[in-house]
């Protein structure tokens, strides 16, 4: 049986279930547990992008639209001239 699983190319069910659970937990925590989630996301995104590009922190806008079944995260970063 183990030999068949080796060649089947399918993931084992435990890692897939764990990944799905982590996604659900992250989504639930964002909906009810962290009032400053957008601020935290903005700061982390700003830190990552700032490693590669010098930019004005005031020109980074993060928005989250939450629907019943889907949440959307939008990030607008104004880059200096010559980089786009």
Swiss-Prot record:
HAMAP family: MinE. It comes from Rhodopseudomonas palustris (strain BisA53). Keywords: Cell cycle, Cell division. The keyword Cell division applies. The gene is minE. Belongs to the MinE family. One of its GO terms (biological process) is regulation of division septum assembly. The lineage of its organism: Bacteria, Pseudomonadati, Pseudomonadota, Alphaproteobacteria, Hyphomicrobiales. The keyword Cell division applies. This is Cell division topological specificity factor. Pfam families: MinE (PF03776). Prevents the cell division inhibition by proteins MinC and MinD at internal division sites while permitting inhibition at polar sites. This ensures cell division at the proper site by restricting the formation of a division septum at the midpoint of the long axis of the cell. InterPro entries: MinE, MinE_sf.
